[in-house]
Amino acid sequence: MPGWRLLAWAGARVLDRGTGGLGTALGSGNRTDICVLVRSLHGKSGTWWDEHLSEENVSFVKQLVSDENKAQLASKLCPLKDEPWPIHPWEPGSSRVGLVALKLGMMPLWTKDGKKHVVTLLQVQDCHVLKYTPKENHNGKMAALTVGGKTVSRFHKSTSILEFYQELGLPPKQKIKMFNVTDNAVIKPGTPLYAAHFRPGQYVDVTAKTIGKGFQGVMKRWGFKGQPATHGQTKTHRRPGAISTGDVARVWPGTKMPGQLGNVDRTAFGLKVWRINTKHNIIYVNGSVPGHRNCLVKIKDSVLPAYKDFCKNLPFPTYFPDEDEKELPEDLYDEEVCQPGAPSITFV
């Protein structure tokens, strides 16, 4: 049912007053009358579905939804009702699934040789596998796993999306990403993913949408020098100048010109993982990553050929806390990191 029809039907239940209500408009087939009624529901006086909710009622509804989401997430930590999918060993050329994490910010970190490194903190919040697509229905070469991260309110999701999550038994997610995986790395939908999916010392690729700067000129967008500031130059100082030649009589595609700066997907390749906090699911990666604070990023094993060998000793296809023989410590460090609390100087 289209959105305007659903809204008109719901409004008719409240505002229909006999022959002059929505029934007459529907019978006449005049869509304009229906739109007028729909617009009346969104007047300055407020909407008819939440105008009578008090602050106490709103807080009660939010608490009720939060408790339901926690119950759904806790049920996924229990053994599944049906048989789990088989786990295959790692093979050369295998490709694992990635994670969806929240960018918290940046902080310094020191290695044992005294060098300072700036790292970015990425927190994995309620990350689950949502859907499995076989390679026959994807691209014919690799299968695909759809992963969702960070639970959000269900009041702003459509009915079809809520039905999809209801079948999975999971609350709705804010960000959904798709990862190409090999057949031996597929994971059952509904499986939770943790920061321990990665290990300190390996290299990852982080993808996110860069910070939007709006419409900018060529000097800020591309680093052009601009025009002279003195010596008779008065008409322009920040324009690009000539953008083509007279013989060509056209502007070549791809010419650097003013336009939108930022707000596009960019990937930072080959970032080293220095530390992992298993209690709060925080990954410490080297350097900066695209995006602003509190944005959701996509993390996966690095595709750079120089770092392919680091995928041999990783949890495959992912980290399962129930099947791990010994419990992981709260913090996992790279062997080069100077751990907090360790002496800075050791006399031999």
Swiss-Prot record:
Q: What Gene Ontology molecular-function terms does this entry list? A: structural constituent of ribosome
Protein name, per record: Large ribosomal subunit protein uL3m
| Similarity annotation | Belongs to the universal ribosomal protein uL3 family.
Gene Ontology CC terms, in alphabetical order: mitochondrial inner membrane; mitochondrial large ribosomal subunit
Q: What GO terms describe the biological role, i.e. biological process, of this protein?
A: translation
| NCBIfam families per UniProt | L3_bact
Any idea which UniProt keywords this protein has? Mitochondrion, Ribonucleoprotein, Ribosomal protein, Transit peptide
What PANTHER family does UniProt report for this protein, alphabetically?
Answer: 50S RIBOSOMAL PROTEIN L3, LARGE RIBOSOMAL SUBUNIT PROTEIN UL3M
- Pfam families (UniProt xref): Ribosomal_L3
- The yes or no answer to whether the keyword Membrane is present is no
Q: Where in the cell is it found?
A: Mitochondrion
Q: Whom does it interact with, and what assembly results?
A: Component of the mitochondrial ribosome large subunit (39S) which comprises a 16S rRNA and about 50 distinct proteins.
* Presequence range in chain numbering: 1-40
Reply yes or no: does the keyword Coiled coil apply.
no
Instruction: State the signal peptide span.
Output: none
